Every structure is written in structure tokens, then in C-alpha cells.
């Protein structure tokens, strides 16, 4: 199996750049890490995170892009810089894994999509639930018609954070919707496709002394029903109430919680499957085996770079997802 020579650009306080880098480092038979760059002052802003990168060579972005032996780049900067560096990687003709959802400029993101599409390079985004084995199985069953025609999807992803992270949300249109709601919108679109209309609600909860929109919902209109996503940073105990409910004409899947930390980054997922028409039927409860949150994601990326696997998330899909996210952030 051919190793992928890879480098990483950036990391961030509230995303998963360090975990992604560690995942590559613990798979040396798959990834040969050439180095990393911290172009937006990450070393000074996040000194506590630098130990993960210390054994490897620090480079400039220009050195990474100019090295013809580096075929793949991981872009993990803070969200507001993602598209800026992703565009540079795309223009250099390199394959790319990028933290979700991209920067806040739709025009720049469209240019990014056009560039990777023209170059036919791998464009792989780090949406958290795409490689959750339970959700992969459930969505395949739903798409195969196991619960009949889908009527609605309800998705929630909340938690409680401190005031500093709440202030961080002010950098984004839609606040929490942009930051975490994107994961949920991805699920809704994969299950039901593009909605006929979107109705966004992005509010300030008042739980923190900030102006950030930390309470977000969006309603999606479909032909035969309504779906919604909800995300807030003002819900204590919200992590274990993160959930996905898929209601169909012949059954229902209720995934709750979406993740349980076992020994981070190891996770478990629990869900209930119900097809009975009896009011008191609790359905069948299933608990997954522990799985690594990032390993399947990065191993899939490597397989795409080697040409062994086709990316199921097309350029056009990523562009439609981003546009829908923007509509939910208004």
C-alpha cells in the first residue's frame, strides 16, 4: 500500500485539527507526515496544542505548496481562514481534507469548488457524522426504503460552553448554526435532498454576556413534511441529548445520543428502531461497539487520494450543502 505524503496547515481551539493530525501520526503505514504550517499565529494563540506537532518539521505554507512530493494537504485553520488556505491548496493542484464547513465568504467558497472540480482533485470535508458507523448503516437502510418514504428528520446538536467560546461564535453569520448546525444540515440533505424552502431562526440566548447567536434553529420544507435542526450552546447536558430522528411511513429511527465519549476519541452511539403501530412499543434498542471518531474519516481520505475509493460527497453536493447552510444562517 502506497503511503500518502501529507502536510497540515493550521489548527484551532474549537475544532479538531490536533486530533486529525494525531490520527495521521498513529497510522504511519498510511500517512507520511512531511510537516505542518501555522500561518495565522496558532503557535501564539494555542501554545497548549503545539505538543502534538512538535516531533515534525515546521514549514511555511509556501514550502508545502511548492513541494511536488506532497500530494495531499489537510487544512485545519480556524473557520474564518479555511477557504483562504483551501483555495491555495486547490490552486496548487493537491488533494485536500478540510475542516467543515469552509470560510464565511460564499463567493470564495464557490471559487474553491470550481477549482477542485476543474483539477479533479480530492476535496474531502470533516463533517463529524459522515463516518459514524451506526449512522452510515442507518442512512443506508433508510435510503434502501426500510422505513418507507421519509416524512421528516429532526436533528439536534447542543451543549454548554464557557463565555469565551460563546464570544468566538460572533465571527460567524448565524453563530451556532454555522459552527455546529452544518453537521445537522448535512444529515438532513443526505436523507431528504434539497428542501423547497428554508426558514431560519438564529437568536441570542442571553445566557452569556456576549452578542453571539448561540441558539439556532432552521425549518426545512419538503413535499410531504417538515424537518428541522436545532443547535445551542446554552444547554447543560446537551451532549448526551444530541439526536437524530428519522420518521418514515413504515418505521422510525431515533439515534440518541449521537455520540457517547468512551475514551476520547473513542465513541459509542445508541439508537432505537421502531416499526410497530402499538402505542407502548418501545422499539428495539441498539448500542454500538466503540469506534474511533476520526480514523475511518482519514483512512477513507487516504484511499481516495490513492484512487482506490470514490468520494461519495460530490463537488456539487458540497456546494449545495454550503449554500443551504448560508440560507440557514440568515
Regions found by a protein language model. Give the residues of each.
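C-terminal helix-rich "cap/oligomerization" subdomain common to oxidoreductases
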Residues: 1-3, 9, 37, 72-74, ...
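Predominantly a Rossmann-like dinucleotide-binding segment in NAD(P)-dependent oxidoreductases
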Residues: 12-13, 129-209
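Contiguous beta-strand/loop segments that form the cofactor/metal-binding neighborhood of enzyme cores
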Residues: 2, 179, 186-261, 288, ...
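Hydrophobic residues in well-ordered beta-strands that form the structural core
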Residues: 98, 123-125, 154, 255
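Beta-loop-alpha module in the N-terminal Rossmann-like domain of NAD(P)-dependent dehydrogenases
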Residues: 52-115
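N-terminal Rossmann-like dinucleotide-binding module
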Residues: 1-51
Amino acid at each position: 500500500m502506497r503511503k500518502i505524503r501529507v502536510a497540515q496547515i493550521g489548527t484551532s481551539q474549537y475544532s479538531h485539527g490536533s486530533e486529525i493530525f494525531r490520527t495521521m501520526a498513529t497510522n504511519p503505514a498510511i500517512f507520511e507526515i512531511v510537516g505542518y504550517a501555522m500561518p495565522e499565529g496558532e503557535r501564539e494563540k494555542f501554545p497548549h496544542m503545539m505538543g502534538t506537532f512538535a516531533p515534525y518539521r515546521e514549514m511555511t505554507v509556501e514550502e508545502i505548496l511548492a513541494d511536488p512530493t506532497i500530494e495531499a494537504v489537510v487544512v485545519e485553520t480556524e473557520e474564518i481562514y479555511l477557504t483562504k488556505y483551501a483555495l491555495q491548496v486547490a490552486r496548487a493542484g493537491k488533494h485536500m481534507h478540510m475542516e467543515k464547513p469552509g470560510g464565511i465568504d460564499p463567493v470564495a467558497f464557490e471559487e474553491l469548488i470550481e477549482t477542485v472540480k476543474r483539477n479533479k482533485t480530492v476535496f474531502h470535508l470533516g463533517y463529524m457524522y459522515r463516518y459514524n458507523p451506526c449512522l452510515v448503516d442507518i442512512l443506508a437502510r433508510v435510503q434502501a426504503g426500510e422505513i418507507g418514504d421519509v416524512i421528516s428528520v429532526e436533528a439536534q446538536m447542543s451543549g454548554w460552553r464557557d463565555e469565551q467560546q460563546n464570544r468566538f461564535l460572533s465571527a460567524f453569520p448565524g453563530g451556532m448554526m454555522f459552527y455546529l448546525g452544518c453537521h445537522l444540515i448535512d444529515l438532513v440533505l443526505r436523507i431528504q435532498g434539497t428542501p423547497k424552502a428554508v426558514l431560519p431562526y438564529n437568536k441570542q440566548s442571553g445566557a452569556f454576556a456576549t452578542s453571539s447567536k448561540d441558539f439556532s434553529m432552521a425549518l426545512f420544507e419538503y413535499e410531504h413534511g417538515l424537518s428541522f435542526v436545532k443547535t445551542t450552546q446554552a444547554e447543560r447536558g446537551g451532549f448526551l441529548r444530541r439526536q437524530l430522528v428519522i420518521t418514515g411511513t413504515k418505521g422510525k429511527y431515533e439515534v440518541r445520543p449521537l455520540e457517547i465519549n468512551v475514551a476520547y476519541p473513542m465513541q459509542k452511539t445508541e439508537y432505537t428502531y421502531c416499526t410497530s403501530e402499538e402505542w407502548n412499543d418501545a422499539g428495539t434498542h441498539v448500542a454500538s461497539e466503540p469506534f474511533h471518531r476520526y480514523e475511518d474519516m482519514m483512512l477513507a481520505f487516504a484511499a481516495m487520494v490513492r484512487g482506490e475509493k470514490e468520494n461519495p460527497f460530490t463537488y456539487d453536493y458540497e456546494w449545495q450543502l454550503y449554500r443551504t447552510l448560508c440560507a440557514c444562517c440568515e
